[in-house]
């Protein structure tokens, strides 16, 4: 905003007050505005409706479809949306709740626990102290960009500390792959030759931004690991939820929970779908992140080509698949509306604008008039995917090639 346009804005805003009678007062106000103090919250109906339905007065994001639990993912995404909306009050409350309840009161000392909710004894507390690396990345990114955009050094410093801890505790060197992001600090390295990875945990724009902010860190090489993870760990051009990497190569894999289930099953049941690699609720975010990234993001063209199966499928089908198996076969076509939202930026990025409009139309057709949310139940995950996709489609935010956030209000 130029000084002239700022002066005109203030003149309109305060035309009926005495403030403009004092040139000194106006100068003070202008200075404050240039420091971010007069930027107003941007109207965003979907964000407002999501806040009403899922965020309590303390800043806790509640997943009503999962026993009212809270995850670090939900907190991280909501902090991002609050930043896009220039909603400082909700950002502050979300951060405060996260630090108090998921990080033992101090994010400088530990990574946040991923799951919080009602325990079997009826108490509300951390259910699993293990951190989730993708949520940790998002929170670090949110803090770094909030510090820059709102000119708050505390946020930037906290984001840097968090990113450094992620590099120490959740970044690993995997034979045959290189330096990459482990999905969590515990439970994802079951033996000396196996690492369990999740491609959707590596948004290219976040890694590109961390590489810029912390040039001596591992982030550029972590971003480089996404290409082989997708090229060797996908199936028929479809991203998988989980990838196994290590001495035996890179291939579609199982989550820790699936591996545990297999160990408990008798042999005749081990071919069941829930114990085989699939692409579904995690993998859908791979398409979303690639679509949101700036076209000039390092390596993006190759990354998009690794998951071209989704683009090919949607040339001839109205909705994305809900489940794809490890051979690239479509198992379930009943994708929720959030899946349609997630592929809109991706389809746009690969030049399929007509197909992108079809997915946006499908999403819009599922909007509930009373709640303003998408889908019959207004599910947590659908709303988050929709907030990312519609926020981008409505040009409320963009990422540049180095991952810097450019919100509409800036």
Where are these regions (language model features)?
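Extended ligand-binding clefts on enzyme/binding-domain cores
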Residues: 42-45, 68-72, 130-134, 156-341, ...
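Short glycine/serine- and small hydrophobic-enriched flexible loop segments
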Residues: 79-84, 138-148, 205-209, 288-292, ...
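N-terminal secretory signal peptides that target proteins for export/translocation
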Residues: 1-18
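Low-complexity, Ser/Thr/Pro/Gly-enriched N-terminal "stalk/linker" regions
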Residues: 38-73, 83-126, 175-184, 213, ...
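C-terminal functional modules
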Residues: 329-410
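Aromatic-rich carbohydrate-recognition surfaces in CAZymes
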Residues: 71-75, 126-148
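Second-shell loop/turn segments in exported
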Residues: 65-68, 80-84, 126-129, 149-151, ...
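Bacterial N-terminal signal peptides
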Residues: 23-33
